Amino acid sequence: MRYPLRLIAFISCTAVLGCSQSSDKSEQAGAAGTRADLKKECFRAVFEKDTADLVMNTTADGKVKGTLVMSYGEVKPNAVEKTVNRGDIDGSFKGDTLFVNYTYKTGSVNKTVYTNPLAFLKKGETLIMGVGDIETSMGRTYFLKDKPIDFEIGRFKFQPGECKN
């Protein structure tokens, strides 16, 4: 008697979860499709042999989502592949500074997902990536509040560019 009850409970939970997920996706698709205030911008930064490509989707209220791909240097003779960080950004503007969480993977071999805070100072059309002290507490990484973020020593200065589809 216990096994049929477990089976019925499992099927019911699966059906409920499946239905709620599909409605969430349709709501998200509808909200994204009706947003006329969404602004897409693409940027590229080059520093010596390193490059970074940033795609930002910004709403009128300053919320930002997008992608960031950073490629570092050349492939070393003993390396499996070139170091490439590829991931998503999610954050918002506070004044002229964009604060985001960058969730990424390094290369295609490493399956570990990392999340780090990033800060970009907007000067005209340029975004300058800042360097600051970070700390991890209770599984969350963040900039230290009592230490300023330095935008002068950052290696990546993003210039606006054409968006690739």
Residue ranges of predicted features:
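Beta-sheet ligand-binding and adhesion/scaffold domains
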Residues: 58, 63-70, 97-165
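Short, solvent-exposed loop/hinge segments that bridge or flank secondary-structure elements
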Residues: 45-63
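Sec-dependent signal peptide recognition
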Residues: 3-10
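Bacterial Sec signal peptide processing site at the extreme N-terminus
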Residues: 20-35
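Tryptophan-anchored aromatic micro-motifs
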Residues: 31-50
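Short, surface-exposed coil-to-beta transition loops
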Residues: 49-53, 82-88, 111-117
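C-terminal motif of bacterial Sec signal peptides marking the signal peptidase cleavage site
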Residues: 15-18
